[in-house]
């Protein structure tokens, strides 16, 4: 009688075999070679199964009580060598697995034993690998040369980062309002810190280039971590750190990410005080096979087929079907109970809506988007910084709010309507007051009232008069005398008109 143990059968193929790839902390070194048991959808008759079991080369009995592991390993190795000499394709051996009430025929792939290590071949391989690393470093840095004419940006909480010309990284606080599709702009009222701007050439590469009489090596080196290869550039010369008294430094890692459409900063962290690490994901390095991520290792499949008699019907391997049928019978019983108790329309327990805050989730009731039912949703006005553009360091002209022609041109006056003023976040009453003051101050000359956006998103109304300074001064003096006379007549104190230049500023920012 045969007995089958999947774990022992998998381990007997190559006892002590090592992982073919590099070291990975998440992998178990004792799991190689890897096997995976797969249950095939096809079936095999009992006659064919016993024929395969009897016709294969005798190796050892599945009853481990009658043989030792050492004898089984020696017999298996001898048979494998004899079979592999005449066969180019994979070879299998068959074992019977019993899982009452069924039996399965499992085909186990026979793996070749690893060859003995050759010291000379290993030394040649190491030398070839060193040359390949040097070539890959130069090739990878050449692929990244296009980054020297561009900038990458990354935002993380309070701080934002810019990586420009592939050699300078700046940390700054961005303005709170950034238009869609525009890079972050530094707030001029906050400080910025340079994390690195001077590439540091690896000492090993510089020494090797000097010994060989070659040109200066690229300011990057290739590093290997497990099966993954990536370029590393170290930047120095950053802003002096107030905690350590030394310059800030940063290490930039370039990783190949197949399928990406553009370069992107993955993340930035401060690993130690004023020492940073940044990862750049780029598809450029994928053009060199040396930087491609390793292929996922697949386990060797142990395929098991169900053994059947011709007269028996194949049972279903899907164990979820009876469970689903049992679950489907539960609401039916509840419906029957509800019908007996007189409930005309019992509700399915599995679809019972949940009441959250007075709202039935899943009830498919149309809810109002406003604060009160039956009213349209409220439209909030855009913030003041909504109209800001990418050039936030300078003033920006928005629109002419009101204008008046001189008396020679007819003296016509044009003012935006109340709807347009509200769209610009302006109060019509404030604009009306400003327009009246500008009309009186300009007199017979033409004038205009403009809306200007200041750095930071604030807006300001500015008035301009088409007159010389002498004429404007006379008009101001005349207007001043008229106001003084009116104040004396009424006995009230009124605000005097402040003398200024041709450009008039009105302190109405808070009322806009």
UniProtKB/Swiss-Prot annotation:
Quick one: where's region Disordered?
Answer: 71-91, 329-349, 485-512
> Could you read off the lineage of the organism from its UniProt record?
Eukaryota, Fungi, Dikarya, Ascomycota, Pezizomycotina
This protein's UniProt keywords: Disulfide bond, Endoplasmic reticulum, Glycoprotein, Lectin, Membrane, Signal
Q: What does this protein do?
A: Lectin involved in the quality control of the secretory pathway. As a member of the endoplasmic reticulum-associated degradation lumenal (ERAD-L) surveillance system, targets misfolded endoplasmic reticulum lumenal glycoproteins for degradation.
InterPro entries with a match to the protein in the record: Man6P_isomerase_rcpt-bd_dom_sf, MRH_dom, OS-9-like, OS9-like_dom
Could you tell me which residue ranges the MRH domain spans? 149-288
Q: Which GO terms describe its cellular component?
A: endoplasmic reticulum lumen; endoplasmic reticulum membrane
Q: Write down the glycosylated positions.
A: 118
Source organism per entry reads Gibberella zeae (strain ATCC MYA-4620 / CBS 123657 / FGSC 9075 / NRRL 31084 / PH-1)
Q: Where is the signal peptide?
A: 1-17
Q: What is this protein called?
A: Protein OS-9 homolog
Q: Does the keyword Nucleus apply?
A: no
Q: Which cysteines are joined by disulfide bonds?
A: 151-164, 241-274, 256-286
């Amino acid at each position: 009688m045969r007995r089958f143990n999947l774990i022992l059968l998998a381990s007997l193929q190559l006892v002590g075999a090592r992982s073919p790839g590099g070291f990975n902390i998440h992998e178990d070194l004792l799991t190689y070679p890897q096997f995976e048991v797969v249950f095939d959808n096809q079936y095999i008759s009992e006659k064919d199964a016993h024929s395969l079991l009897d016709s294969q080369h005798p190796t050892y009995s599945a009853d481990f009580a009658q043989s030792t592991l050492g004898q089984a390993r020696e017999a298996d190795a001898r048979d494998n060598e004899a079979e592999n000499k005449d066969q180019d394709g994979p070879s299998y051996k068959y074992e019977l697995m019993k899982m009452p009430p069924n039996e399965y025929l499992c085909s186990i792939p026979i793996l070749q034993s690893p060859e003995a290590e050759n010291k000379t071949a290993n030394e040649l391989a190491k030398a070839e690998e060193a040359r390949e690393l040097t070539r890959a470093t130069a090739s990878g840095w050449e692929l990244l040369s296009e980054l020297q004419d561009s900038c990458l940006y990354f935002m993380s909480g309070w701080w934002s980062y810019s990586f420009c010309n592939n050699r300078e990284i700046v940390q700054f606080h961005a303005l709170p309002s950034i238009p869609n599709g525009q890079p972050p702009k530094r707030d001029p009222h906050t400080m910025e810190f340079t994390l690195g701007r001077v590439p540091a050439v690896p000492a090993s590469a510089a020494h090797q280039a000097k010994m060989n009489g070659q040109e200066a090596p690229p300011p990057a080196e290739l590093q290997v971590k497990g099966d993954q290869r990536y370029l590393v550039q170290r930047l120095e010369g950053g802003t002096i750190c107030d905690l350590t008294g030394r310059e800030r430094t940063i290490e930039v890692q370039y990783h190949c990410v197949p399928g990406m459409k553009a370069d992107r900063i993955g993340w930035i962290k401060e690993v130690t005080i004023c020492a940073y690490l940044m990862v750049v994901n780029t598809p450029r390095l994928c053009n060199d096979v040396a930087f491609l991520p390793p292929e996922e290792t697949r386990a060797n499949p142990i395929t098991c087929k169900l053994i059947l008699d011709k007269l028996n019907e194949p049972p279903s391997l899907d164990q979820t079907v009876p469970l689903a049928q049992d679950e489907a019978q539960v609401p039916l019983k509840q419906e029957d109970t509800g019908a007996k108790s007189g409930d005309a329309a019992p509700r399915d327990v599995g679809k019972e809506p949940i009441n959250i805050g007075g709202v039935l989730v899943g009830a498919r009731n149309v809810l109002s988007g406003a604060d009160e039912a039956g009213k349209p949703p409220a439209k909030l006005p855009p913030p003041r910084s909504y109209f800001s553009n990418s050039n936030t360091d300078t003033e920006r002209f928005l629109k002419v709010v009101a204008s008046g022609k001189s008396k020679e041109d007819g003296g016509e006056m044009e003012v935006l309507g109340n709807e347009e003023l509200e769209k610009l976040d302006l109060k019509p009453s404030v604009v009306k007051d400003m327009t009246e003051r500008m009309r009186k101050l300009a007199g017979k000359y033409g004038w205009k009232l403009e809306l200007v956006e200041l750095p930071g998103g604030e807006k300001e109304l500015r008035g301009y008069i088409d007159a010389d300074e002498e004429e404007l001064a006379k008009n101001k003096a005349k207007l001043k005398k008229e106001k003084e006379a009116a104040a004396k007549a009424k006995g009230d104190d009124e605000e005097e008109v402040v003398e200024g230049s041709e450009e008039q500023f009105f302190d109405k920012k808070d009322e806009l």
